[in-house]
């Protein structure tokens, strides 16, 4: 799953559509974690919710 401490354990590498992006990022294959309040790891999840354990 996503590292709950990603905001401190990963470098902030930029922004996308107004939210922070945490690296590493190596487009097009490694996309990093997007968001600071709700983080989505685009390398683990495609943001459709299917990767979330509830």
Swiss-Prot record:
Start and end residues of each stretch annotated as N-terminal extension: 1-36
N6-methyllysine PTM sites in chain numbering: 29
GO molecular function: 3 iron, 4 sulfur cluster binding; 4 iron, 4 sulfur cluster binding; metal ion binding
Cofactor(s) this protein requires: [3Fe-4S] cluster; [4Fe-4S] cluster; Zn(2+)
Protein keywords: 3Fe-4S, 4Fe-4S, Electron transport, Iron, Iron-sulfur, Metal-binding, Methylation, Repeat, Transport, Zinc
UniProt feature, compositional bias: Basic and acidic residues: 9-20
List of residues binding Zn(2+): 16, 19, 34
Residue stretches making up the 4Fe-4S ferredoxin-type domain: 35-54
Region (Disordered): 1-21
Binding residue positions for [3Fe-4S] cluster: 45, 51
Cofactor binding remark: Binds 1 [3Fe-4S] cluster. Binds 1 [4Fe-4S] cluster.
Job of this protein: Ferredoxins are iron-sulfur proteins that transfer electrons in a wide variety of metabolic reactions.
Protein name per Swiss-Prot or TrEMBL: Zinc-containing ferredoxin A
Gene behind this protein: zfx
